[in-house]
């Protein structure tokens, strides 16, 4: 999966699931869109669907530090490369 595909998938998820229409890739989701821990859990579930396998507890823990779309995409790229 290319970076562009990851970005497009994440933007689609944010639009469909969280009604975030046209975010900047460096927007802080928590500050700008009031993204909370419940939203983060829902996003992790969608990321698992996107990559086609469950995340480990360690991977989920690492995800809790993510704040921007670029960081989400970096995170997914890292996980895909590891597998």
Model-derived regions, located:
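Phosphopantetheine-dependent thiolation modules in NRPS/PKS and related acyl-activating systems
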Residues: 2-45, 49-83
């Amino acid at each position: 999966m290319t970076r562009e595909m990851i970005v497009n998938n994440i933007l689609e998820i944010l639009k469909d699931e969280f009604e975030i229409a046209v975010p900047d890739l460096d927007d802080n989701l928590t500050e700008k869109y009031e993204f909370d821990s419940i939203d983060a859990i829902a996003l992790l579930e969608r990321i698992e669907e996107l990559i086609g396998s469950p995340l480990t507890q360690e991977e989920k823990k690492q995800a809790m530090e993510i704040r921007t779309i670029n960081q989400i995409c970096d995170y997914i790229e890292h996980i895909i490369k590891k597998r």
